[in-house]
């Protein structure tokens, strides 16, 4: 009984074990995931690259040389494309934007290049004898000085006395202030270069464009403050037209905010940080220099002419700018309200004039038709707001200007003949906040001087990204490859240098072909960069502008990006494919998300961020897999002639077989002749004379055959003899016959043995298949019985449980029904 019980328990355990094993096999039989390469996925990352310019240069002055050199830019696209990215949130930071740094460098380079061919005014650093040239009541006394000086002519030992008009701001007295001897203001601190007489300073809109392989992201949030996430993002190839206006305190001729005034600052609570105010409505400012000046040229030497103011004709009036008081006061009130929202509610906002510093910072400086104006803005920021008429800003004009792009450099601008008028739009303000302990009042003052803030006010909504068209993701598709066991050794050679493998043998060097291809491309890229640097260093000799250099760089960058992507696709065996399967299994440690979760719920940007830490590992595995595949294909091609047995029956192969057979037979016959001759020679040397080849040799008879002939004739006791073959052909035929018989017997034995082995193997294989079939049927029946038993057991348990539940419910029902009876019985008992 105990044995039977144990046997039954073991049977149940065996059934459950088989069931568990089947479930495990089904789970393991799930499809594996493999790495698949995709080309052209919408993925990007932040990058810094060389931007080039586009401009409508032909729409502006053609004769005058414009300092912005926009004639070297590419034409603007008449139909610019802007693609809006849905459900994309991107971070922007206008204070750490490489586009600002690049534009700043470009404008500096343009100014420097425009001044290179112009005249150095070092010979003018001489003593000037000056007198007051203005007597008009509207002009400050001494604003212009009539100066005479001695100048060396072409003949060095002769001097010529000349005279010219200078602004008082451009000269300083030598010695005491009452002296009539002056010098140019920058002679002891910096070199002075005269701007070319035909330079046009009017700003021309410049569009910055990204080269192929890169894109510019644009933030379209109307209240975007310049930093943080932006939810309304689009991609463009070029920015809008940006006028490179060099000004301080007031931003001129820029773009306007679309929805209310916007305050932008890197840290508004830090009073050392500049505050950029972006207006939503422009304020017009009209500036004029009414003097009707004339210009004269002073010959300094061969090919050198100094242009100065010759005379002032007519009424001399001060240069000035006019602004509508009502419009300006309304704008200032809106700015106050916007600034107040960034501080506690009880804080009062107050404006005041500049606190001091260089003339370029304390005044609103800008260029108007070639003349540099310096206007006093204290009337704009006096915080009274009582002037609703026209606000007039008094302005000064300087011809010797401190260059904003570097310290210790100055520029002399040639005087412009006639009246000068320019109309501009104020689109922004540059402010700074006072420090101090006053918690209820915040004072803001105009400032400027850092031209990066001017460019930043226009480039705040842009950023450059690099497009990453290569992406990898798991799929169920696997590349069909030539399978071969992968060797672990030899991968260390992947880290050898490009030229370091030149002395390796071909088998070892073939492993590093991938590395060599990559290093070859990087060498080309490095060489192109070196060439561009050499061109940039010699651009003054090649007469190339900064835009020409940038166009060269953009073209090279586009080729480099394309070659880089195509190189990777070629290394992975995916050339010319948009979707390329591999035989690299997907590792769940890279991402344990299911395929449906990846493809249905994630964007390519989210997916790339998730696997970005493993991208290099995946790329390396794909590369190693492709290298192994190419080695396998090479070894397979070496055995290509054995791939098809039908080639053996080709007529050309048969002729080759016959040729080999004839050579073998001829060799055997030749060897037989050689050995026969050697045997005869050996016997002759021993003194033996060979008998005729007709000699009969005895042939013994068998015991079952009588001697003599069958008729009983012939001599008894005599042995039979056989004839030796005679002649060369008979000898060759005898050898060939013996060779064929020998080959036939051994080939027959080999075929019989092989047939016996094959028959035995097939018989055993058939028996094994029958055994497996019986085993499969047995276990199928066992699984079926186990399932039936499990179903029956479950049914019994469910039935018993149901019966018990019904019984409990019946008892509860009877108890409820018997309640009135019990009450009645209790009442009767109580009455008795």
From Swiss-Prot:
Q: Where is this motif: Di-leucine internalization motif?
A: 831-832
Lipid-modified sites (S-palmitoyl cysteine) = 740
PTM details? Highly glycosylated by host. The high number of glycan on the protein is reffered to as 'glycan shield' because it contributes to hide protein sequence from adaptive immune system.
Span list, region V3: 287-320
Q: Where is this region: Disordered?
A: 695-717
Q: Which CDD domains match?
A: HIV-1-like_HR1-HR2
User: Where does the UniProt annotation place the signal sequence?
Assistant: 1-31
UniProt-recorded Gene Ontology molecular function terms: structural molecule activity
Please give the positions of the paired cysteines in each disulfide bond: 53-73, 118-196, 125-187, 130-147, 209-238, 219-230, 287-321, 368-422, 375-395, 574-580
Where do the coiled-coil regions begin and end? 609-643
Keywords in alphabetical order, please. Answer: AIDS, Apoptosis, Clathrin-mediated endocytosis of virus by host, Cleavage on pair of basic residues, Coiled coil, Disulfide bond, Fusion of virus membrane with host endosomal membrane, Fusion of virus membrane with host membrane, Glycoprotein, Host cell membrane, Host endosome, Host membrane, Host-virus interaction, Lipoprotein, Membrane, Palmitate, Signal, Transmembrane, Transmembrane helix, Viral attachment to host cell, Viral envelope protein, Viral immunoevasion, Viral penetration into host cytoplasm, Virion, Virus endocytosis by host, Virus entry into host cell
The UniProt record's further free-text remark is:
Inhibitors targeting HIV-1 viral envelope proteins are used as antiretroviral drugs. Attachment of virions to the cell surface via non-specific interactions and CD4 binding can be blocked by inhibitors that include cyanovirin-N, cyclotriazadisulfonamide analogs, PRO 2000, TNX 355 and PRO 542. In addition, BMS 806 can block CD4-induced conformational changes. Env interactions with the coreceptor molecules can be targeted by CCR5 antagonists including SCH-D, maraviroc (UK 427857) and aplaviroc (GW 873140), and the CXCR4 antagonist AMD 070. HIV-1 lineages are divided in three main groups, M (for Major), O (for Outlier), and N (for New, or Non-M, Non-O). The vast majority of strains found worldwide belong to the group M. Group O seems to be endemic to and largely confined to Cameroon and neighboring countries in West Central Africa, where these viruses represent a small minority of HIV-1 strains. The group N is represented by a limited number of isolates from Cameroonian persons. The group M is further subdivided in 9 clades or subtypes (A to D, F to H, J and K).
- The entry's protein name is Envelope glycoprotein gp160
Tell me which species this is from. Answer: Human immunodeficiency virus type 1 group M subtype F1 (isolate VI850) (HIV-1)
Q: Which gene encodes it?
A: env
